[in-house]
Amino acid sequence: VIDRIARSFIEPFSVGELANYSSSAIRRYPAGTQAKDLADAAIHEMVVRLGDPYATFDERRMRRKGKRISGIGIEATILDGRLKVIAPLEGSPAQKSGVEPGDIIVEIDREKIYGLTLKEAMDRIHGPIGTEVLLRIQRKGARKLGLPVPRARFRVREVRHAMFGDIAYIRVAFFGPDTEKLLRKALGAIKKEMGGAKPSGYIIDIRNNPGGLVGQAILLADAFLEQGMIVATTGRHAKGSRRYDAYRGDFVNGSPILILQNEASASAAEILAAALKDNRRATIMGTRSYGKGIVQTRFPFGAQGQIKFTTHKFMTAAGIQIHEVGVLPDIVVNGDPRPTYGAAATSIDRCPTAGKARDRMLGCAILFVNKGRSIDSFLQALPKLN
């Protein structure tokens, strides 16, 4: 385990450092402690000492038996010792109960969780199906609030589509194992609904998409590119780096694409957005994305369990590292009408509504496509605020 971490972790750690951490953890236990418990303590100490908010140690024999265990459907990280929600998964108990991107979970079942690792915090959230977990949440600009959230099995609908006139809308909520296959199915359905005609444009909505399988994001980017670099992953050593290029051809034959993103679009979602933006294949509308541009790898080691830690960073086709930077939109649509990030900008209050949810961001996206995808024409067409 020590050797694996020393060789693969994204930041340099010596074998000696890790061995010292391991030894100090073992010395805290009394004589006669079982070897397996000492091994768990040593591994846990090393993982914590990495300072990697995404690092976890999963002890296989600690997995609960006899009960069906479930979570609530959130992607989260540890930030300054606090559990921060990247985004609730679409259709999850967390989303239905009112958990929002950016929420800070400060208590779980009335117990403070400051300083816990990501795994320790998530283990407290998980529990038997049919039970409830009480979250105390700090939300920006609001008082702390308590949210009871049921633990339940749920299924994320990875891809769905709709038509707004001759504009095709594709929602990608998460990158699961079938996302690319579901995209191809959606494109086929759109073609059938259009009677073989070509849509005037495609809107790909990755708002509140916390990521998922990187390989699926690469496949989706490849589906809209004729050629060009999609993403590169860089490890600590040159031999761990890899470049991914488009090769399958553009499934929509050059039709215009607009991507909707927000501050909860993360990881794999950012790979898709950056690849299409940097290859000048899509216009990005919304806000700066989350900025999770790192890859975690799982390393199983027999009956003891598995560890997961950061091994690579993403590099976009433009040579930018996404991590802690995010993908910048071409058109900023938020609550502030002042231009930011060097991009065109408008207040979301100026956007028309669209769909049953009266979605203003989507309304702006439809308007942009209808105005010939010209930023100037789009901004001129927006109604002025009183």
Describe each region flagged by the PLM:
Residues R49, P53, G81, V106, ...:
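PDZ-domain C-terminal substructure recognizer with occasional recognition of PDZ-binding tails
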Residues A19-Q34, I43-V47:
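Amphipathic alpha-helical segments that form the core helices of the histone-fold
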Residues I104-R136, Q216, K292-R298:
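PDZ domains, with a preference for the canonical peptide-binding region formed by the helix
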Residues V1, I5-R7, A94-T117, I203-D205:
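Conserved PDZ fold ligand-binding element
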Residues P93-I104, H126-P128, G195-G196, A275:
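A short glycine-leucine-enriched loop at secondary-structure breakpoints
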Residues R160-N386:
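C-terminal "post-core" interaction segments
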Residues E45, G51-A87:
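PDZ/PDZ-like peptide-tail recognition elements
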Residues V1, A42, M46, I74, ...:
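Terminal peptide-recognition signature
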